[in-house]
A protein has these predicted regions:
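Multi-pass alpha-helical transporter architecture, strongest
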Residues: 166-190
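Short, small-residue-biased leader/transition segments that mark boundaries at the very start
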Residues: 2-6
Length: 190
């Protein structure tokens, strides 16, 4: 059970951290690469917020239908794919906005099932589990922002944080895949 809690934290930290690699630098990407004006960023951020709300609702609903681990796993695939597409398509303004909405929806679609997994694996210490999921989320935010800034500091440009984010999300994907394999094996023994 302790290994599963650690895996849940890794899944949360890196799965979300990959999005923060890119999202921490979304304004310069949208203004310098996609070609939006600074004034349009308010509306673009409203779209990101609406996407987060929709993603949160979808993540909870799909977790009830398909299971939390499965939702986390597939949502992280969508997030990694969105980040990969952003790397290549950020200069197409309308596509950059659509991909932003997909990634921000994914960021919040994955949150409820991640919390559910951590609470489920924290039996007897649910309050500590709830605190740990928030710590993991915040660490992911910090790690993602730092890692996303490295290619910018190296002069590679504002597309590259998304590419770094792909690899970080994939770490979370591997962790949740190991969890879901173990969960499937334990269910098949019942």
């Amino acid at each position: 059970q302790r290994q599963m809690c650690i895996r849940d934290r890794i899944t949360t930290m890196f799965g979300n951290g990959g999005i923060f690699c890119w999202y921490s630098y979304v304004t310069p990407l949208m203004t310098h690469v996609a070609g939006f004006s600074e004034n349009s960023m308010t509306f673009i951020m409203v779209l990101a917020g609406l996407s987060m709300t929709v993603g949160n609702l979808m993540g909870g609903k799909f977790s009830d239908q398909y299971g939390a681990a499965r939702v986390v796993k597939y949502t992280q695939v969508i997030m990694a794919s969105g980040l990969f597409a952003i790397f290549f398509a950020a200069s197409v303004s309308w596509l950059a906005v659509i991909l932003m909405c997909i990634c921000t929806a994914g960021l919040f679609a994955v949150s409820a099932p991640q919390q559910l997994l951590l609470l489920r694996n924290s039996r007897g210490g649910e309050m500590m589990g709830a605190a740990c999921v928030q710590v993991a989320f915040n660490l992911g935010n910090a790690i993602g922002a730092y890692a996303g800034g490295l290619p910018i500091d190296a002069g590679l440009g504002y597309r590259y944080p998304a590419l770094v984010g792909v690899f970080i999300v994939l770490i979370g994907f591997v962790a949740v895949s190991l969890y879901s394999k173990r969960e499937s094996a334990s269910l098949s023994r019942i």
